[in-house]
Amino acid sequence: MSGDHLHNDSQIEADFRLNDSHKHKDKHKDREHRHKEHKKDKDKDREKSKHSNSEHKDSEKKHKEKEKTKHKDGSSEKHKDKHKDRDKERRKEEKIRAAGDAKIKKEKENGFSSPPRIKDEPEDDGYFAPPKEDIKPLKRLRDEDDADYKPKKIKTEDIKKEKKRKSEEEEDGKLKKPKNKDKDKKVAEPDNKKKKPKKEEEQKWKWWEEERYPEGIKWKFLEHKGPVFAPPYEPLPESVKFYYDGKVMKLSPKAEEVATFFAKMLDHEYTTKEIFRKNFFKDWRKEMTNDEKNTITNLSKCDFTQMSQYFKAQSEARKQMSKEEKLKIKEENEKLLKEYGFCVMDNHRERIANFKIEPPGLFRGRGNHPKMGMLKRRIMPEDIIINCSKDAKVPSPPPGHKWKEVRHDNKVTWLVSWTENIQGSIKYIMLNPSSRIKGEKDWQKYETARRLKKCVDKIRNQYREDWKSKEMKVRQRAVALYFIDKLALRAGNEKEEGETADTVGCCSLRVEHINLHPELDGQEYVVEFDFPGKDSIRYYNKVPVEKRVFKNLQLFMENKQPEDDLFDRLNTGILNKHLQDLMEGLTAKVFRTYNASITLQQQLKELTAPDENVPAKILSYNRANRAVAILCNHQRAPPKTFEKSMMNLQSKIDAKKDQLADARRDLKSAKADAKVMKDAKTKKVVESKKKAVQRLEEQLMKLEVQATDREENKQIALGTSKLNYLDPRITVAWCKKWGVPIEKIYNKTQREKFAWAIDMTDEDYEF
């Protein structure tokens, strides 16, 4: 018997095929060997195990009963088949139960009990139900673990084929279907990922398509988080010293903070100006202790060098930061913006323009401002007035502080306000230019300017008649209105002496600001203007005027000193009241807006050539814009890097010219080859070279246009008029008419600001 265990698989199988009588040989296999063979080939193991003499009593008994039934008649054979089928079904049910018990046990261990599995249906968790073949490992595990498991009977060839066929059908029917489902799921995933951001994107609020609020009402609901205050002062390191009269001096925290403001500007032109130094020293002494006041009596003896070097080093260190450090700062700023940079207005999330309170520092002002150098004090929560709706959550002040006041005024557009200490003016936190409130204000401004178009001829006729009036007051008003209309001058506000810089508008012109020339440069009746305009920008212009205007100016200047007012019977109040009488809503700014927009529209019609390419059309647009900027006196100092940038641009132009010359030589050579060869290949080469030449010519033209544009704009600020005085619908219509991408004219911020114009305007729009 033990010798039979040494037979290999092939010998056993050969003996089985040669003679069926070997079925009842007395050979036994130990349990481990039997299960190993069962694992390799299930069907073969079943056949062998049937003819084995089991060591278990149940197996021997069953084997004897089978031998008896072998010699019975046909009816006994049928009974045997029936018995085998029943036995097969019983084992199948036991194993399915075993597999089910294992699954239930596992699910209970995981803390849940799942519902019965439905055949061929996917699980709730997204996985497909395993087919019958997937249960095999559980069966094998069961066979190996159960020592009392009964040996399997021989399967006939038909039964084996039937099982194989069913197995293949199950594979085709059950496996393929879930695979397809899984495949579909995988294919759908990228679509879901693509759609997700779209859902998260906020839909642009088309407020211009909605009904407007009643007059005076700005909003119905307003909620925000309040302002972000400047960080507290961080004292200087001990190694950074302040010197007075050559000796080290330790400053108190308040005095040190103000000293750092001056140190940061040490290399700036401001710190050399006497008025700046005087105002700074006066305010600095207010922050000193008594001992410091007694010691520090002369600003010239103060040495801020180490402080200045420290801040320069800090600035340089920020420039040398790693990408990771810069990214961290960017993320912190974005987090701050997300929390404080938006408000909810009438169920829409609106961007806030300036949610950070300006830090303390030294006032600079524009031009030669009399208050430059004064200390801008730190704004505290106790200075702040909050504005929100009654049903909104009031923003919380910083711990240990409280707001000055909380208001619920829906007739104003500001969210936060406070009074600054230099001019005593009120500062505001407002919404971004792309918001509904700002957009509506812009739209209304340009519509008012369009209304002026209908009555401007009548107004012009009226002020021409008034030049002949018997009243000096009426004559002065008429000449001032002529200047506002023709030269786009600002009206000019009344100012308290010594409070602001000496800037001039139309009504505040003095005799010293104009010179009269009966003839100049071949033109008659020329008025030469020279005065400091807004932001102390010099306004210089020589303008030929009508004879009656010239005569009136001579009359206004009679018996006056240079510092006397030119229009001594006129002020802005009188002028504005007269403008309101002429047309509701009319101001000097409306005249500027009207003249700027009309000028742009006329210039675009004159300068745009239909056959020009896009870069040339953009140059035409910038030239039209430049005409408006000159009209409105929107000047600027040439950028510090202007010469360097022009040199770089010229280098690019020269390099492009060299490339173009090489490309043209290559084209000439290719054409010569094509004449000789006369084949398709050389023709293709010629076409390729032609395209290369055309491409380089276009690139060169773009660079040359860019150079021309920069040179012409070096002292002209195009942005001010584009943002504040030019009806954006003129630009949008022009872009649509001539196929110029709007991105070439408006940057992202400007496109957001003028979204209403971009959406509603077609190419036929007329201002």
Swiss-Prot record:
Crosslinked residue numbers (Glycyl lysine isopeptide (Lys-Gly) (interchain with G-Cter in SUMO1)): K119
Protein family per UniProt: Belongs to the type IB topoisomerase family.
Annotated gene: Top1
Annotated Basic and acidic residues bias: 1-23, 40-110, 131-168, 181-201
UniProt region (Interaction with DNA), positions on chain: 427-428, 490-495, 587-589
Record-given protein name: DNA topoisomerase 1
Location in chain, cross-link Glycyl lysine isopeptide (Lys-Gly) (interchain with G-Cter in SUMO2): 103, 105, 119, 136, 150, 155, 160, 166, 174, 206, 338, 551, 644, 702, 714
DNA repair is among the record's keywords: no
Lineage summary: Eukaryota, Metazoa, Chordata, Craniata, Vertebrata
Region annotated Disordered, chain positions: 1-201
Keywords: Acetylation, Biological rhythms, DNA-binding, Isomerase, Isopeptide bond, Nucleus, Phosphoprotein, Topoisomerase, Ubl conjugation
Localization per Swiss-Prot or TrEMBL: Nucleus, Nucleolus; Nucleus, Nucleoplasm
Species in which this protein is naturally found: Mus musculus (Mouse)
